[in-house]
Amino acid sequence: MINKIHFGKRASMFRRKKGLSQGELAEHLGVTAQAVSKWECGNAIPDIDLLLELSHLYKVTINDLLEDVDLLYQVTGRETGNSNIAYFVPQQERTYNIEWANEIRNGNWIQRNWEHSRKANPSMDKAGEEIASCEGIILEIGTGPGGGFMPYILKANPDATIIMSDLSPTVVSEWKHFLDKTLDSPNLYYAAFDFCNMPLKENSIDVISDCGGIGNCEGEKAKALKEAYRVLKPGGKLITSTGFVTKETLAALPVEAQKILLDKRSDVFEDLYEDTVLAGFSKIDSTISGYWYTDDDESTIADLARSLGVNLKFTSYIRCCTKE
């Protein structure tokens, strides 16, 4: 069955990409502007002659206009079933994560974080615009309850094609539930998997968007970077953001605090540049995006820093890595 709402959204997207107003398209087709509006609102579908004319105008097939694309099947070979989520991990939340998953649901985290993203945020808005300007399939890894860069990408381009992924099936299903009601976009897809072992075909993704996912992953960061390189198409980009504690900041800490931090959380002192090169990326552009302090944060590293009586300064960066 044809989803008229999704047809309307695709029809509107193709028209805008062509640079036409509803009135200009109506004049070209010999119909009224009201007819075009009905199509794009999902209230009607044009007859076959007009569909053929639209397919010629937009240089797409009639099926491209009418049918939802099973993008996840194309890039993974896995059908999503009735849930429309591709699960590569158990659908039940991991035992140690159940309390956190319940907090996401009961605390309405998804909606609150989405609404927060609608406010002006120069750094995140700029990153979203940069990612949205890239053509093709965007994979958001480690989406998390905050959504990563995804909300800012959609702010810049509501028609963007995005696969949202996370290791937590709760995160993925909660985002799908919310965005189905909020946007009902035919270009949003959902998958639960470990991005240290992506179930994606080689050279299948145009852009990978990572807002702290790799920096906070449960597996090996170096493996996650290698997987990102593998699934990107030649010319594709990994746009990644995370934070680390510089050697200078470490050296300024009390000696005992240095020893404990290096023993318990050596990962926070890694900027991942060398691992990014070893993954295969040869063109890497890094920009310092800001700073944050553990005294202002609620996290395991912040708790550790407070227990040691230190206020760790993290340097945040956004890094654009191109697969040449």
Predicted region positions:
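Conserved class I S-adenosyl-L-methionine
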Residues: 74-135, 152, 171, 239-263
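Class I SAM-dependent methyltransferase SAM/SAH-binding core
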Residues: 139, 144-197
